[in-house]
Each structure stands twice: as structure tokens, then as C-alpha cells.
Amino acid sequence: MLKFITIIIFTMVLSACSNMANLTLYQQLDGKAGLERLVDSFINQIGNDEQIIHYFEHANISHFREGFINHLCVLTDGPCEYTRDSMVEIHTGMHITEADFNHVVDLLINAMNEQNIDHTVQNKILAKMAPLRSQIIKI
């Protein structure tokens, strides 16, 4: 009987892992509601950071919020279409340094940790964002 129960539990664990692997990042983040929570945490991180806040002095925060939620939705294979300005258009003239870029990544990681996002999911999100780095630094 114990062997049977062990097999059932093992099968359930494997099934749960398999189902998680089939979910998109968007689904693993709890869809739009999860993205909203993440972006709100990220905005809070930025707002409390003296090194980065100057980049947002003249920003429309609600516009940034909606745009970043939409951007993440597309990036995580959600049901969205990104129709806003490109990353080059958004960041041109901001003269973002490599140190500040890396610091913003740290703030995003802090926000993901605050939202208890699994580290595997965090790494997948960061890997999808990494190609944007060259489009953002010092343009």
C-alpha cells in the first residue's frame, strides 16, 4: 500500500511539473494581474531610488505603467500587441549609463522578489529582456 501511495504522489508531482512547463511566462506570472503587481512594485522601487529617479522626473507614470505592462505582456507571450514607441525611440537622448542600466535591472529583480516570482521565471524574463540592452544604453 505504501508503495502504491508513493507512486501516486510521484506521478502527481511529475504531472504538476509537466503542466508548469507548458504554461507561458505570462500564465506563470498570473496574467495581467500579475504583471500589474510586478510593474507597481517596480515603479515603487524606482520611486524610492535616488540613483534612478531623475530619469523619470518628467515622465507620465501612468503612461509608463501601462506601456511597461504591455511590453512585458508581449515579452512573456501574453495576448497583447505592443503598439507603442520602440525601445530606441523611448530611450534616445536619456544617455543611460551601463551602471544605471544594471541598477534598473537590480530594481526589477527586487520587484520580482517582492512579488515572490520564482527565480527560474525571473531568469527567463531577464533573458528575454537582455537583447534590449544595446538599444537602451547611451543612446
Positions of the model-derived regions?
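Bacterial N-terminal signal peptides that target proteins for export
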Residues: M1-T6
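C-terminal motif of bacterial Sec signal peptides marking the signal peptidase cleavage site
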Residues: S15-A16
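Acidic/polar, glycine-anchored loop/turn motif associated with catalytic or activation segments
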Residues: N19
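Heme-based O2/NO sensor domains and their adjacent alpha-helical segments
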Residues: N22-Y26, E36-N113, I117-H119, I125-K128, ...
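Glycine-centered helix-coil hinge/cap
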Residues: D30-G31
